[in-house]
Amino acid sequence: MATANDVVLRAITMDNFAECLHLAVREDQKGFVASNMYSLAEAKADGVSIPCAIYADRDLVGFIMYDIAANVGRGYVTRLMVDARFQGRGYGRAAMGLVIERMKAKAACREIYTSYVPENEVAGHLYRSLGFEPTGEVDHGETVMRLVLYDGSFAP
């Protein structure tokens, strides 16, 4: 299984843009996550999302997108996909770990939210295993999860 040391996040540039657009989940997973083309267009339009290519060694294996709303102390992981050829190797977990660490480094980020299509049991298991808990909310048919980084209390 991959670890955060095996995986790096890189900016989407003209050098990897086309390859990123060609990443795809399995056919039975297509309803679980927006296409990378849509996600990149959304990032360009909203001006706050941070899209990243997930690399393992020299291979582009997936895509993750997040943003940090410092004014409300929240981070959001809005997309995570690993190409069908590279699934089951721990790359999604490693990429999530890297994004969580980036958000922890932002003092204003106290909690992280994400969501998943309920039928995507693998995503639900992944997020729970990383410490995310269901909020009880449903957003556009997706189960909302939250990871508390800092609850405002101080340890003695």
Regions found by a protein language model. Give the residues of each.
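Acetyl-CoA-dependent GNAT
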Residues: 6-78, 83-85, 96, 102, ...
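Conserved active-site alpha-helix within GNAT-family acetyltransferase domains
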Residues: 93, 118-136
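Conserved GNAT acetyl-CoA-binding A-motif
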Residues: 103-115
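Terminal substrate-recognition subdomain of acyl/acetyltransferases
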Residues: 2, 143-156
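Conserved beta-strand-loop-alpha-helix junction that forms the acyl-donor binding cleft
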Residues: 113-124, 140-142, 150
